[in-house]
Amino acid sequence: MASACASSTIAAVAFSSPSSQKNGSIVGATKASFLGGKRLRVSKFIAPVGSRSVAVSAVAADPDRPLWFPGSTPPEWLDGSLPGDFGFDPLGLGSDPESLKWNAQAELVHSRWAMLGAAGIFIPEFLTKIGVLNTPSWYTAGEQEYFTDTTTLFVIELVLIGWAEGRRWADIIKPGCVNTDPIFPNNKLTGTDVGYPGGLWFDPLGWGSGSPAKIKELRTKEIKNGRLAMLAVMGAWFQHIYTGTGPIDNLFAHLADPGHATIFAAFSPK
């Protein structure tokens, strides 16, 4: 679905060009309806170009979709087809179709890493706080002793993550080129989208095989939770810088003394 969404977005930008309007396409009406807040339906139009015909499709734009600011007009390149698209791009970072496609994948993978990072910060710290576990805090994890030195661990991580990220990058450049298992060639994935490999390892419950509306709903939830996780990880990092403790310790301290243990106390002279 992600590749299809990206394609539809690319088409939307391409169709809004002056050359497309001169060729008798329906883009003029499409753009006017979009800016005027009217619902558009997907339809096909055959426009003669020289001695051949070119089939184009109008991109569906739903005026009732949620926007980051109610009543605002979303940019042309954010037509609501991408998961988590609420029309927010004040810097125009997605105005170029290729940049939009790349940024969508970058946000997706950063969201997933942030969700893993947030779980690794909050859950062990909370369980240690209530006495279930006895683990070092996330901000001192690099100071602990492991089965080998940190340089060796870094090299191992670099090789493993580099291999995985290399295959992900190849799939972005040429969708579907990594759908065959490199170790067991008989294991192949079909009908997958860029960033959503599916299969037994990445979709064991088969949630990605539902209706398009359901799939987009799940992908939107993933992006929204990922964005929240990125903010949470950044917040935990700043909390440790200014307080010297983690978010769970800060929470318990605030609950014990809500009048004094606040965010303002970290910036008050002692």
From Swiss-Prot:
Membrane association type: Multi-pass membrane protein
Superkingdom field: Eukaryota
Binding site for chlorophyll a 3: Q144, E222
Chain sites annotated for binding chlorophyll a 1: F88, E107, R227
Modification after translation, per record: Photoregulated by reversible phosphorylation of its threonine residues.
Assembly notes: The LHC complex consists of chlorophyll a-b binding proteins.
Name of the featured protein: Chlorophyll a-b binding protein, chloroplastic
Species this protein is from: Petunia hybrida (Petunia)
